Regions:
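A well-structured
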Residues: 1-179
Length: 179
């Protein structure tokens, strides 16, 4: 679907009809929705067992796929932010319903937009850079066991279990969890 979407690039024109624009937005939504579903599954699978090589592999594959798809549809985002004048942007946004605020928000970042090739590099580095480090950190720290006194008993728990106490509304419990 993302490959098919790439063909729209040649048809982008700030003077297009609202109907055409909404059809393009619908395609972007469909692609994003599908990626969210499969990415969500991979993320939940990984979150349920960060030590699982299978879940880690699936998560890595989905991150890579997400980056590839983002790179394929990136041109639309950049076109919207940098190549559509204010008058046409307002005209096109008028009939977008609940997406109007989102589209207006996107345009606020126009001055920070990089070239398409630079944005693609950033998308790719997100998968191999910080995301990879976070996964490695999770894999290492999720095998640690922590001892915490809860009531009259000392409990042994994982980092994830301890995090529940760190976020407690009770300040004394939070303090104990941090120690």
């Amino acid at each position: 679907q993302a490959k098919k979407f790439e063909k729209i690039k040649a048809k982008l024109n700030s003077k297009m009809s609202s109907k055409q624009f909404n059809m393009i937005l619908k395609q972007v939504e469909e692609i994003s929705h599908k990626m969210s579903k499969i990415g969500g599954y991979a993320s939940l699978s990984y979150s349920s067992d960060t030590q699982s090589d299978e879940a880690t592999s699936l998560m890595t594959q989905m991150s890579k796929l997400g980056s590839e798809i983002s790179n394929k549809i990136l041109f639309f985002d950049l076109w919207w932010k940098t190549q559509v004048d204010e008058k046409n942007a307002n005209r096109l946004m008028k009939d977008t319903g609940e997406l109007k605020e989102y589209l207006a928000y996107k345009r606020l970042f126009a001055k920070y937009a990089l070239s398409e090739s630079e944005e693609k590099i950033i998308n790719t580095l997100d998968v191999t850079g910080i995301s990879a480090l976070v996964k490695l950190y999770d894999k290492i720290t999720n095998v640690y066991e922590y001892k915490m006194k809860v009531g009259n008993k000392t409990k042994v728990m994982t980092r994830e279990e301890l995090t529940n106490y760190v976020r407690s509304t009770n300040p004394k419990i939070r303090e104990t969890a941090y120690k």
